Amino acid sequence: MQDLKQTIETAFENRGELSPASAPAAVREAVEQALAMLDRGEARVAEKRDGDWVVNEWLKKAVLLSFRLNDNEIIRGGATNFFDKVPLKFADTNSEQMRASGVRVVPPAMARRGAYIGPGAVLMPSYVNIGAYVDEGTMVDTWATVGSCAQIGKNVHLSGGVGIGGVLEPLQAAPTIIEDNCFIGARSEVVEGVIVEEGAVISMGVYIGQSTKIYNRETGEVTYGRVPKGAVVVPGSLPAKDGSHSLYCAVIIKQVDAQTRSKVGINELLRP
């Protein structure tokens, strides 16, 4: 693993000299191996160690290098064709392999190779980008998008039209992370490396980036970049000091209770 990491780190330092025609075989093989590990869930761009999220920068670099090393090519896809550098995850998968994976994929859902989809996950017509990690039992609902290298936990529900930000463009230091058992309401956006901690519930139409104020109405505290464990969050606004206008914010209105959980619980009938 250390040799693989070093090969990718060195190649990234010299990425300006690389092209599909000129890339050394060792670099190409290293990037391919890293992407295969991401695809199988054997490696993650970010992982929790001793309670803290740690970013594996070298894997993010491998994802970026793959765009340098590969030409666009025709990708066959049902009723149409595509022209891209990254093949589709399930393009060469047969029915036995899909059954073994425990994943359900509803047309025309798309996942790029290099994304991991865990057992029991359901992809409604949605999009999962390269380097993303979608853990077991998670529902990615219709028109939801999981950005490059985003980390989605177990038994998460990403409702219709949800956007989870990626790291590739604009280039972000850390991926967006949705921890286990979270519910993200329809048309909400969580981007720029924001962390939504375990069991949180984000209401419909909430937008959270690193500069978004997260206001706790019980304590009056304003925080940024992280939604606390078990918080229930709705869209709101905070007035300017001079009272001339208000600006958007996300508001923590309470902690998840039994009533909230009953409304956002996982429906096992919909799982594979």
Swiss-Prot record:
One of its GO terms (biological process) is lysine biosynthetic process via diaminopimelate. Signal peptide: none annotated. It comes from the Bacteria. GO terms for molecular function: 2,3,4,5-tetrahydropyridine-2,6-dicarboxylate N-succinyltransferase activity; nucleotidyltransferase activity. InterPro entries: DapD_Trfase_Hexpep_rpt_fam, Hexapep, Hexapep_transf_CS, THP_succinylTrfase_dom1, THP_succinylTrfase_N_sf, Trimer_LpxA-like_sf. SUPFAM superfamilies: Trimeric LpxA-like enzymes (SSF51161). One of its GO terms (cellular component) is cytoplasm. CDD domains: LbH_THP_succinylT. It catalyses: (S)-2,3,4,5-tetrahydrodipicolinate + succinyl-CoA + H2O = (S)-2-succinylamino-6-oxoheptanedioate + CoA. Substrate binds at residues 104, 141. It is an enzyme of class 2 (transferase). Pfam families: Hexapep_2, THDPS_N_2. Keywords: Acyltransferase, Amino-acid biosynthesis, Cytoplasm, Diaminopimelate biosynthesis, Lysine biosynthesis, Repeat, Transferase. It is found in: Cytoplasm. PANTHER family: 2,3,4,5-TETRAHYDROPYRIDINE-2,6-DICARBOXYLATE N-SUCCINYLTRANSFERASE, MOLYBDENUM COFACTOR GUANYLYLTRANSFERASE. Homotrimer. Belongs to the transferase hexapeptide repeat family. This is 2,3,4,5-tetrahydropyridine-2,6-dicarboxylate N-succinyltransferase. It comes from Alkalilimnicola ehrlichii (strain ATCC BAA-1101 / DSM 17681 / MLHE-1). The gene is dapD.
